[in-house]
């Protein structure tokens, strides 16, 4: 029985346990490295200001007073944790190297002090240059020595100190190099080295840290204690310093910067100070369970603890924690362990002063002779508060001091003022111990955060303020908090679909309005748009590049900055700030580390804008002499750079503005010279027949706005895909070089269903949809238009990155997140006789389609070589082979078509039809004409093809035939092509379009009647000719009569056998078969009885060819609309139709034509009343 067992308290320092001896030594030797590292972190967080102060501070803080024995402690700290000793020779070499670095740095500091006191002294400038170079060389050598194979981990803490010193040294060269007499190219070289070394040093530190941590993973609690101490100590001595490396980028952080470390570190005296490894199944993982998963940052404001008695020992048994987020909202957590509210001891409740220290009294109790297993728990603990050192106690204070594990940031002052960390949360791991053969375990785990992570997000108007996004107060749906990669100073946020990340409240410490710029540090597996809202209003939206590939680990190089170039203000001293991402496909990953707010003054803004404009202008050219512009510099980009220059301040940089303006004008002229398009700025459309742009009449030219600096065009949708909205231009053969690739590119503000074609041997075709941004101007900007009506391109506006590009290739349907497009085409041999040219076409054939585009360019990209050259030669040969085949085919088809057309007329003057020419014969001839292929391009039927001349020649004669036929037929709309226009209707009838594209009159009821009054010449002879079809029983009748008698009629039934035209005979037995062949498919062209007297259609003036097979290459397609154009659409009548005629001699000047039936359905194809020849 437990109450009969004598408990024995075993002090841990009395056990003969070598592991305990090592840990005790760690506490005694590890303090100095922790003290120095925390002091350095404090210095980098608070004293990182422009000037020589950083160099002096590093010398005074570290390199000027640390002795060789102190450096030995840095090495010993990690050696003991990983149980790996550095060989004596390598240890001595490392310490000697560090001492040498300190001596070299001291000499450099002396030279720097002397130069600072007398910066114009040439000798002092030379001295500081020499000593900088010597120290730089020494650091390069030393840091390489600290990466000695097999000893990277124990050397890591001195590696990071040397790396930090090297970055500081290079920062001095970038900041003061020109003052030392270095030329700008050398200074820029040092800057590039600085950036590259930030990447390299960060990678080495993270790789080495992760390897060392992974090596310490184990299975029991003793191994976890060592694992956790390594994680905690190296966070303080390595990772925190690495997280501040980016601040050495003096061009990104030119003024004092406020940073925060949001990561958490853990202490647990029950586990870490235990003299034994607790006998607990899977103890390592159970201990690690006490580490909180990634979460938005919170700050503990209440703690209640209850005791539990385990084997006669009263220990911490459970607790209740509540916290507040950065918005001040309370967060209630589930209770930990066994919590009894009635017996809870109050530790803290709504107290704004956090705890900076714990004094713990762990107990390790073993049962008597009958029970050798331990009870491990916390018998008591005292909590000390910041500011006043006030103490709160659970039962009693102890001797295990958290300051031994997490020292103050400055040992010279009172720890309640100079503390480095505060207690942020308390978790609990518990093992019941009732299982036979195991210990009992009650282990509170204390979570600590660095004091730089403040409970609010306060913006300093004099500093760059970095706000980790993990300090938001509310996550948005779809956002998760993930473990930081180690170099960010805390956890980060992730999204895999578009939307806002989290809501953040910021407090402005200063008077309003203060202007700010913003940067977002992000990583992404896809191109995306990042947007920012302030107080619920979107102030920025910009396109940014991917920074990593899917599946890649998060590294320092994975992160980049999304910069808001437009200054903005906060409307209130406490405002919301939200970062979001969209316009990317779900499943990609987007990470946000932090956002940064940069205060802007008039001088700073002018200098920033000038520097940005200078970089943008210089980046346009291939060299500093500005002979040419880069191939990838688009015309749109030049316009945007011009806007940057135009918006520079006349007050601060007038001369520089004029110089840059001349350069950007030169770049624009060079862009115009290489552009093979005529009128790229859309001065007009259809102005010249064979030059410039041709387009449909619904296209409008718009003047420049906030997106386009120059004119652009708007293409609307169309209600009929056979009559698309189009814009095209021909690139003349004389402008093209043989065996060269050309590129079409431009800028699309927004589009839907915009088709882009490049045509030569074949058609390169893309359909491009670009999501529009709407207005670029945020709601807070009242007037983006100047007083004279021109757009104010200098006003704050929503931006996207003009440098992003999405280049489509043949066959793709691009859903562009970029507004740029590009499409290339290869040109083979050029021949002015063939005059093949290149056609540039933009087309929209849907009702919802639309596009706004400008800055179009067609320019030479590169000569063709290798595979590309072979491919274009193959395409050229294939095109010529098909061209020859087409010529042979065209000769045959043209001959047949011409014979059919000539047969319609009495002579070669084509001014009179043959007496027996009827409408069916004209249609048949027209169909043969339309068998001539390549009269027009299938991609756009207004562009002439190779056979356009002969096609138009015959089409003109077909039109003449129709005209003469219409003049000869005195019945108006006798073919019902215009519905029921000119006909009188009684009852219900309809005009329907059959599946062979012929319009017919359908009389479905016996009481219905259709009639027309026709004026004639008395005494002349006429022929009434009707082509019709009768369904069902009864008869269909077409009657001609005058007022008084003189009546004649044509009757139709499905049981009549007689001669028909053309050569069709019908019997009663044929009715069913004819029905099946015809199919009975009608499409109504009549909109109802009330519209019967209106004209429903007109004959189009443009008849393009019908293609019966694919054109020259597989890339060319038939135009489905060709079958709907002109009289060529008419096909021969289906079987069952008959043509009847009679002679009629009117006695008056008016006759009536009446159509009706007795039963069933009567279908009339055409009614003709032809004047006989004299």
Curated annotation (Swiss-Prot):
Gene Ontology molecular functions = signaling receptor binding; toxin activity
Report which superkingdom the organism of origin falls in: Bacteria
What processes does the entry annotate via GO biological process terms? sporulation resulting in formation of a cellular spore; symbiont-mediated killing of host cell
One family from Pfam that matches here is: Endotoxin_C
Has keyword Chaperone? no
Sorted alphabetically, the keyword list is: Sporulation, Toxin, Virulence
Q: Which PANTHER family match?
A: ENDOTOXIN_N DOMAIN-CONTAINING PROTEIN-RELATED, PESTICIDAL CRYSTAL PROTEIN N-TERMINAL DOMAIN-CONTAINING PROTEIN
Q: What is noted besides the main data?
A: Toxic segment of the protein is located in the N-terminus.
Q: What does this protein do?
A: Promotes colloidosmotic lysis by binding to the midgut epithelial cells of many lepidopteran larvae.
Q: Which family does it belong to?
A: Belongs to the delta endotoxin family.
Q: What is this protein called?
A: Pesticidal crystal protein Cry1Fa
Highest classification ranks of the organism: Bacteria, Bacillati, Bacillota, Bacilli, Bacillales
Protein's gene: cry1Fa
């Amino acid at each position: 029985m437990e109450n009969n067992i004598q408990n024995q308290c075993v002090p841990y320092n009395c056990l003969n346990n070598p592991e305990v001896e090592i840990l005790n030594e760690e506490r005694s030797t590890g303090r100095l490295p922790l003290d120095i590292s925390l002091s350095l972190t404090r210095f980098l967080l608070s004293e990182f200001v422009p000037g020589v102060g950083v160099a002096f501070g590093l010398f005074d803080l570290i390199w000027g007073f640390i002795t060789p024995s102190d450096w030995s402690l840095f090495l010993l700290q990690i050696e003991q944790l990983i149980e790996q000793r550095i060989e004596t020779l390598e240890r001595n070499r490392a310490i000697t190297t560090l001492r040498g670095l300190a001596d070299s740095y001291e000499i450099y500091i002396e030279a720097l002090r002397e130069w600072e006191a007398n910066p114009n002294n040439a000798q002092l400038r030379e001295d500081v240059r020499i000593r900088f170079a010597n120290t730089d060389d020494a650091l390069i050598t030393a840091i390489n020595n600290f990466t000695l194979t097999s000893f990277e981990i124990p050397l890591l803490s001195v590696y990071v100190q040397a790396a930090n010193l090297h970055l500081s040294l290079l920062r001095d060269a970038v900041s003061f190099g020109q003052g030392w007499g270095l030329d700008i190219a050398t200074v820029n070289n040092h800057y590039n080295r600085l950036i590259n070394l930030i990447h390299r040093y960060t990678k080495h530190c993270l790789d080495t840290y992760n390897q060392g941590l992974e090596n310490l993973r184990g299975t029991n609690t003793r191994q976890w204690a060592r694992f956790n101490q390594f994680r905690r100590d190296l966070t303080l001595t390595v990772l925190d310093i690495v997280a501040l490396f980016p601040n050495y980028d003096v061009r990104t952080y030119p003024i004092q910067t406020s940073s925060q470390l949001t990561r958490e570190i853990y202490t647990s005296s029950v586990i870490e100070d235990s003299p034994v490894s607790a006998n607990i199944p899977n103890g390592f993982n159970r201990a690690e369970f006490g580490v909180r998963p990634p979460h938005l940052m919170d700050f503990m404001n209440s703690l209640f603890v209850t005791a539990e008695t385990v084997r006669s020992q009263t220990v911490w048994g459970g607790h209740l924690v509540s916290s507040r987020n950065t918005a001040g909202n309370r967060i209630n957590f589930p209770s930990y362990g066994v919590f009894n509210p009635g017996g809870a001891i109050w530790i803290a409740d709504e107290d704004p002063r956090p705890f900076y220290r714990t004094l713990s009294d762990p107990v390790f109790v073993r049962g008597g002779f009958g029970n050798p297993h331990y009870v491990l728990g916390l018998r008591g603990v005292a909590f000390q508060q910041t500011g006043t050192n006030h103490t709160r106690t659970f039962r009693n204070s102890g001797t295990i001091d958290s300051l031994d594990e997490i020292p103050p940031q400055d040992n010279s002052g009172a720890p309640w003022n100079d503390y480095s960390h505060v207690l942020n949360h308390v978790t609990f791991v518990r093992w019941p111990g009732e299982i036979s053969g195991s210990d009992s375990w009650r282990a509170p785990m204390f979570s600590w955060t660095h004091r730089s992570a403040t409970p609010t997000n306060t913006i300093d108007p004099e500093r760059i303020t970095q706000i980790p996004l993990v300090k938001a107060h509310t996550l948005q749906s779809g956002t998760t908090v993930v473990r930081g990669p180690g170099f960010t100073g805390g956890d980060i946020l992730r999204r895999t679909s578009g939307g806002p990340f989290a809501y953040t409240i910021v407090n402005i410490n200063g008077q309003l309005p203060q202007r700010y710029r913003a940067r977002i540090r992000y990583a992404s597996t896809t191109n995306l748009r990042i947007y920012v809202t302030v107080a619920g209003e979107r102030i920025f939206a910009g396109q940014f590049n991917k920074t990593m590939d899917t599946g890649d680990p998060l590294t320092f190089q994975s992160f980049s900055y999304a910069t808001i170039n437009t200054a903005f203000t906060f409307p209130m001293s406490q405002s919301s700030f939200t970062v979001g991402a969209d316009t990317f496909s779900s499943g990609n990953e987007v990470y946000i580390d932090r956002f940064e707010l940069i205060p802007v003054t008039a001088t700073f803004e002018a200098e920033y804008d000038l520097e940005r404009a200078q970089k943008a202008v210089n980046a346009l050219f291939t060299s500093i002499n500005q002979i040419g512009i880069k191939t990838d510099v688009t015309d749109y980009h030049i316009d945007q750079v011009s806007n940057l220059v135009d918006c520079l301040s006349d007050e601060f940089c007038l001369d520089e503005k004029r110089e840059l303006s001349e350069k950007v004008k030169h770049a624009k002229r060079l862009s115009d010279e290489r552009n093979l398009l005529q009128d790229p700025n859309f001065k007009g459309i259809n102005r010249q027949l064979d030059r410039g742009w041709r387009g449909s009449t619904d296209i409008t030219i718009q003047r420049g706005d906030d997106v386009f600096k120059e004119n652009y065009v708007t293409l609307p949708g169309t209600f009929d895909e056979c009559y698309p909205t189009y814009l095209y231009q021909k690139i003349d053969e004389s402008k093209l070089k043989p065996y060269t690739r050309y590129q079409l590119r431009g800028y699309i503000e927004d589009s839907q269903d915009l088709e882009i074609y490049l045509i030569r041997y074949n058609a390169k075709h893309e359909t491009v949809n670009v999501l529009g941004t709407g207005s670029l101007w945020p709601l807070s900007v009242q007037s983006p238009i100047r007083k004279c009506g021109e757009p104010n391109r200098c006003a704050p506006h929503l931006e996207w990155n003009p440098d992003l590009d999405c280049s489509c290739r043949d066959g793709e349907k691009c859903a562009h997140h970029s507004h740029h497009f590009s499409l290339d085409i290869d040109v083979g041999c050029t021949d002015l006789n063939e005059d093949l040219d290149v056609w540039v076409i933009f087309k929209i054939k849907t009702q919802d389609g639309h596009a706004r585009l400008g800055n179009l360019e067609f320019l030479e990209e590169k000569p063709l070589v290798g595979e590309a050259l072979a491919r274009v030669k193959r395409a050229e040969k294939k095109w010529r082979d098909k061209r020859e085949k087409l010529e042979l085919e065209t000769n045959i088809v043209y001959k047949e078509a011409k014979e059919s057309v000539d047969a319609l007329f009495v002579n070669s003057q084509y001014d009179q039809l043959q007496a027996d020419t009827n409408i069916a014969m004209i249609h048949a001839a027209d169909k043969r004409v339309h068998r001539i292929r390549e009269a027009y391009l299938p991609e756009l039927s207004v562009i002439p093809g190779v056979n356009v001349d002969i096609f138009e020649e015959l089409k003109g004669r077909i039109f003449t035939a129709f005209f003469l036929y219409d003049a000869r037929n005195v019945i108006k709309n006798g073919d019902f092509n215009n519905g029921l226009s000119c006909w009188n209707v009684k009852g219900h009838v309809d005009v329907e379009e059959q599946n062979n594209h012929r319009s017919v009159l359908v009389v479905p009821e016996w009481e219905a009647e259709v009639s027309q009054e026709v004026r004639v010449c008395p005494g002349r002879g006429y022929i009434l000719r009707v082509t019709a079809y009768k369904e069902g029983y009864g008869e269909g009748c077409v009657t001609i009569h005058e007022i008084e008698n003189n009546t004649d009629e044509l009757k139709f039934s499905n049981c009549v056998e007689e001669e028909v035209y053309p050569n069709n005979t019908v019997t009663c037995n044929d009715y069913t078969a004819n029905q099946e062949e015809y199919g009975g498919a009608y499409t109504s062209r009549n909109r109802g009885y009330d519209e019967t007297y209106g004209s429903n259609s007109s004959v189009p003036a443009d008849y393009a060819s019908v293609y019966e097979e694919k054109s020259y290459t597989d890339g060319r397609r038939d135009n489905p609309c060709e079958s709907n154009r002109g009289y060529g659409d008419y096909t021969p009548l289906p079987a069952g139709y008959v043509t009847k005629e009679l002679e009629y001699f009117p006695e008056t000047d008016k006759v009536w034509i009446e159509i009706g039936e007795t039963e069933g359905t009567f279908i009339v194809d055409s009614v003709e009343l032809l004047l006989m020849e004299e």
